[in-house]
Amino acid sequence: MNYLDLIIKEYISIVEMLQGVYEVESNRIVIEREVFRDYLEKYAYMTFSAKTKVYKALNFIIHDSNNYTMPYKDTELKKTVRKVIINYSTYQEVKKLYETNANI
């Protein structure tokens, strides 16, 4: 199995687990950095920083430059904090493509 297959399978499984726990809001799942790190470090076929680079490049997460997080207005804390934002629309497209057989 190649790295792209591993990354995609891992991404799909992570989002499926997250959507059972977190609310999908505006095609986004907002999670804490520690939660994201725990999921990405579970399978050590690549380092955390290498995986976040790939996630950013493939638009799996919504981020600002030079980081894997985005400022997010936390309504409970009433302040802006940095969170990981999973791009749910990318997940839907990737999952559909990954599970569809090409009739070539």
Question: Where do the model's predicted regions map?
Answer:
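Extended alpha-helical interface modules used as scaffolds for assembling large macromolecular complexes
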Residues: M1-I104
